[in-house]
Amino acid sequence: YEMAHGVLPPGTVNPDGPIVSEPDGYHMSWTVQLLPYLDQTPLFLAVDFSKGAYDQSEEITEASMSVLICPSYPAPTGAVSYAGCHGGTEVQIAEDNEGVFYLNSRVRYRDIPDGSTNTIFFGEKVWSSAELNWLSGTRTSLRNTGHEPNQLPSIRDSREKLYQSNQTPDGMSDPAVVGGFGSWHFGGAQFALGDGSVRFLSENIDKLVYESLGKRADGTLPVDF
């Protein structure tokens, strides 16, 4: 995508902010933009871009793509296991949070002075029934490193039993909260960095180092993580 467009895909496309996790708005996520590069061109062509993320056909909103689902978790139809990194602190998606993906973002590799090796692009997240469909450029497809991996109590507990229909991760009942990364793996979660490498980061990672990895230009380069 970057080679074809000269920029990384926007975290979410919408006329303006704020962006909250409610089914109201255009809210087209980075996942939609990347479909042709994930061997999903027919699905990409089926999306009606004159309509928003919540006005697509059921065939589209409930599509399941194995490339976007963690093999360790049998996610329901229309769900995704991975989120783009919005930044290093818990702020609104409409703000440039020094991450790579945010509202109408057009980040180039030269806009990542910390280096792609030291910048998180994507990470795992724990799905909950409070999330919107996979096209939604909200916390469904964007998270931040302001919370250490797996550190929300409900994420830790959910690894012992799957979410019930009325359970949501801590704070996720607030549509303004973006939230952090997490996984069904004990000990941490998988992350894709800007250089194409994938790293398993411990849930005990140093908080400041982890926050720095979520930022593309804070000038703090982690020596080891």
Regions from the PLM with identified roles:
Residues 1-225:
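Surface-exposed loop/linker segments characteristic of extracytoplasmic
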